[in-house]
Amino acid sequence: MQTLPSIAALAEAFECTPTIEADHPELGVLNYEVEFDSEDERIRLSVLPVAEEVNVSLFTKRPPRIVRLSLEDVSKIVVSEKEGVKRVEIHFHNSEVQTLSLHLRPVVTLIWGNQQDSPERHPPWERD
């Protein structure tokens, strides 16, 4: 996972000041959070770089909805902005898992799914 420079990039994308905590200072375990809060939604990312874990919480205010994802095996987090679209991408070590894409501006959008859907995951009558 990316280290400290990614905290600044996430904070800039989320337009906030990150919270950094050392859960176990003797082990050097860091946990950092960023939060994006707008009139319609609140999004929080909690990152444990050493454990390669990311928790994503998305709260919509109108109508009220909550989506929470606990992600493991995260290889890197990439923040980008192109033509006014702010995006956070969460990549995984497993190449069969699609990158999670979270668009913050102009509209909050969360896109994630499997790149390859294994036939073994479906009953025989659904397989082609």
Give the predicted meaning of each segment.
Residues 1-128:
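Surface-exposed, interaction-prone regions used to assemble/regulate multi-protein complexes
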